[in-house]
């Protein structure tokens, strides 16, 4: 049984980073809504509790508060930003709406000697005071600390920037240790989790595989499982894990909608059916998808059609497997957090061809989500340990509707054939061109790269003749979180090489352009 850190989410945009930083310290952490019941907290048996930041003001009525059981659980508690403010208010301190807000970098002076900050600093003043470079994002501030607390840190505009009750092991910080801008943030969280809470750092992917396999076998027994295999990272890793656990009790359904990358269907079948021995039903539904997409130009309409058609095809195939009792999905932890914590998922339309939401009710199948505790980077690590090739596990994101949203306007088979060949040349070139400064390929240096088919023709000259052919745009971005992105400054010789190959090798394209738009104002995908 692993030690667990309970994170209560008050709505911060960076709450997931808290969990990730703690897991990087090899301690299991889970995020749950701030309004969980006292009974839930007792049953969870946390080794420590963290209260996240949030957009609300403690000074207003009807804003969130922590369950009273948090402060009665007998375990260390860390309040971050709003979490510190609600801790102060609930334990008898005073919070006020600050007239001088703090957003961005700040230098914090450590005060007194506390177990939370002792020995942690970025630099010292000539007087010997320990200083920290942190990231602030708050308007409210604590005016009076609750009884039993001592001052832990301060800034010029925020006299109580951190507080500590060493007896009860309650700590509050006004800054965000989970973001990389707080230089010593990782050290602070590790100090709290490993030293103050005393959590054992035993959250390892190797151990996770053994535990997951055991749990899957207990849950499934001798019953059969069906999984929609898209070729994406999540469903691929889920298939590999399930196959290790239950072998031939797993059947995967791979739906080819005709909008996959070059040779992708063959690669998926080779990897899972031939190399791993997974039972895979390959359904070539490209004609049905193309028929439904004929004449449709609106991007969201295309997404909905592709999603609905996938559900229909998958439902038909699943209905033939009369012995299947479970439906497996590649749901990962961020999906679980959004669904449980903010209710966002319920409002989302189908965005990918492998989203099979609603099928459990339709098919009367029990739901199995073997990856629901893992973040994306953990899923990738798991995939490698399960024997999937890194080239598959670490490849760039690919939209669920596939090339359907990389072909502007109406989707035609001719357009898809041209695009997948151009895209393959671009990706192959990114993999082979090495940056001399980093000794990494440009594929590894970009977060996402792809070609886009533009349904317009331009005049060109090839040989002694005039051409009138289609245009392809290349897109490559660099990003940490895909919320914002910079266009990648690819070397000119690389772009020239790609353009030359596409124009010479893909008949029907005579012009290649490069997209230099950032996000915002543009999105990463064109549709």
From Swiss-Prot:
Pfam families: GATase (PF00117), GMP_synt_C (PF00958), NAD_synthase (PF02540). The active site is at residues 81, 176, 178. Pathway: Purine metabolism; GMP biosynthesis; GMP from XMP (L-Gln route): step 1/1. The keyword Repeat does not apply. Keywords: ATP-binding, Glutamine amidotransferase, GMP biosynthesis, Ligase, Nucleotide-binding, Purine biosynthesis. InterPro entries: Class_I_gatase-like, GATASE, GMP_synth_C, GMP_synth_GATase, GMP_synthase, GMPS_ATP_PPase_dom, NAD/GMP_synthase, Rossmann-like_a/b/a_fold. It is an enzyme of class 6 (ligase). Its EC number is 6.3.5.2. ATP binds at residues 230-236. It catalyses: XMP + L-glutamine + ATP + H2O = GMP + L-glutamate + AMP + diphosphate + 2 H(+). Residues 4-202 form the Glutamine amidotransferase type-1 domain. Gene3D superfamilies: 3.30.300.10, 3.40.50.880, HUPs. Catalyzes the synthesis of GMP from XMP. Homodimer. This is GMP synthase [glutamine-hydrolyzing].
């Amino acid at each position: 049984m692993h030690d667990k850190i309970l994170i209560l989410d008050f709505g911060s945009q960076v709450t997931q980073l808290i969990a990730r930083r703690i897991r990087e310290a090899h301690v299991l952490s889970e995020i749950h809504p701030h309004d969980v019941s006292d009974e839930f907290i007792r049953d969870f048996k946390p080794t420590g509790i963290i209260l996240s930041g949030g957009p609300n003001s403690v000074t207003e009525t009807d804003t969130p508060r922590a369950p009273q059981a948090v402060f009665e659980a007998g375990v260390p508690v860390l309040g971050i930003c709003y979490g510190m403010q609600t801790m102060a208010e609930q334990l008898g301190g005073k919070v006020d709406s600050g007239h001088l807000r703090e957003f961005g970098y700040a230098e914090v002076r450590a005060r007194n000697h506390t177990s939370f900050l002792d020995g942690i600093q970025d630099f010292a003043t000539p007087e010997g005071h320990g200083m920290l470079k942190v990231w602030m994002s708050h308007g409210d501030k604590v005016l009076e600390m609750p009884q039993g607390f001592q001052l832990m840190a301060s800034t010029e505009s925020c006299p109580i920037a951190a507080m500590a009750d060493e007896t009860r092991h309650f700590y509050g910080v006004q800054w965000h240790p989970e973001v990389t801008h707080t230089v010593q943030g990782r050290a602070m969280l590790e100090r709290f989790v490993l030293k103050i809470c005393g959590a054992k750092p035993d959250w390892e992917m190797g151990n996770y595989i053994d535990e997951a396999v055991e749990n899957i076998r207990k849950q499934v027994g001798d019953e059969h499982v069906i999984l929609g295999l898209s070729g994406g990272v999540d469903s691929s890793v889920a298939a590999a894990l399930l196959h290790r656990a239950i072998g031939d009790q797993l059947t995967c359904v791979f739906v080819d909608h005709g909008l996959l990358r070059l040779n992708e269907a063959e690669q998926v079948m080779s990897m899972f059916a031939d190399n791993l021995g997974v039972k895979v039903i390959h359904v070539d539904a490209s004609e049905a998808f193309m028929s439904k997409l004929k004449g449709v130009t609106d991007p969201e309409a295309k997404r909905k059609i592709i999603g609905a058609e996938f559900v229909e095809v998958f439902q038909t195939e699943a209905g033939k497997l009369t012995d299947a009792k479970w439906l497996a999905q590649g749901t990962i932890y961020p999906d679980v957090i959004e669904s449980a914590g903010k209710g966002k998922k319920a409002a989302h339309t189908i965005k990918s061809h492998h989203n099979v939401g609603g099928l459990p009710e339709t098919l009367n199948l029990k739901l199995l989500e073997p990856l629901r505790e893992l973040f994306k980077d953990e899923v990738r690590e798991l995939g490698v340990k399960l024997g999937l090739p890194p080239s598959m596990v670490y490849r760039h994101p690919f939209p669920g509707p596939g090339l359907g949203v990389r072909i502007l306007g109406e989707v035609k088979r001719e357009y898809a054939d041209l695009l997948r060949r151009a895209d393959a040349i671009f990706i192959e070139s990114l993999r082979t061109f090495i940056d001399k400064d980093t000794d990494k390929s440009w594929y590894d240096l970009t977060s996402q790269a792809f070609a886009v088919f533009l349904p317009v023709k331009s005049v060109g000259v090839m040989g002694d003749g005039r051409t009138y052919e289609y245009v392809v745009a290349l897109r490559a971005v660099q990003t940490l979180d895909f919320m914002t992105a910079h266009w990648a400054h690819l070397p000119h010789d690389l772009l020239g090489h790609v353009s030359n190959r596409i124009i010479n090798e893909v008949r029907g394209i005579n012009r290649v352009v490069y997209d230099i738009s950032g996000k915002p104002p543009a999105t990463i995908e064109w549709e």
